[in-house]
Amino acid sequence: MRRIKCTIAYDGTNFAGYQIQQQKRTVQGELERALSIIHKGQFVRVYASGRTDATVHAYGQVIHFDTPLTIPDERWPKALNALLPDDVIVKEASEVPSSFHARFSVKKKEYRYRVWIGEKNVFLRHYVYHHPYDVSVPAMNEALRYLIGTHDFTSFCSAKTEVDDKVRTIYEAEVVQEGEELIFRLVGNGFLYNMVRIIVGTVLEVGRGERCAEEIKTILEQKNRSVAGKTAPGHGLYLWHVSYDN
């Protein structure tokens, strides 16, 4: 058996999320359907670097699957894209050692979150969070700096989070303004359920002047979801890049 690693992108608008769900359209479901056709009806399980929720997008999700087929690496994207719907694309594929795992071998993940602060744009409604308020980018970057490092992120994850260990390391956290768009960028060794969206929702409150940047430190210390801000909507979030050891 060969293990194939693929980098994929998808528009999450019309998906119930990445992970397979009964009676619902999912990214994993579309990938496994396409692979089943290529394997002449044989089921092939797909493993991903992590799950994304309904309406969340991916620019650089990573998956792997095992196959007995001898299709060359460079032909896998073309073969799969011919069978996948228009809102999922395989960008590249390569054979990897059997020790590689799309989820368990991850070293870093980068998420980006897009916020539109200008007038409502009907063509961007599925891809940015419309937030038409004056915000201070320097204040938000000051707030984000408190998140860099290793912390218990209990305050910044959903109460539905199933994992016990809520300690994560954030390596980079920043927001930049490009015209009428704010782009949040967070790089870490892993992220809890809704963590990026809660961080964005809270930091936007700092940007609006409703909180001071130093409150982020207090929120972390309290380890209480109710003291952080609202969860920003899913459609502004992108899984941008997943890093592994070479």
UniProtKB/Swiss-Prot annotation:
A molecular function (GO) term: RNA binding
InterPro entries linked to this entry: PsdUridine_synth_cat_dom_sf, PsdUridine_synth_TruA, PsdUridine_synth_TruA_a/b_dom, PsdUridine_synth_TruA_C, TruA/RsuA/RluB/E/F_N
Top-tier EC class: isomerase
Coiled coil regions in record: none
Bridged cysteine pairs (disulfide): none
Family according to the record: Belongs to the tRNA pseudouridine synthase TruA family.
Annotated protein name in UniProt: tRNA pseudouridine synthase A
Species name: Anoxybacillus flavithermus (strain DSM 21510 / WK1)
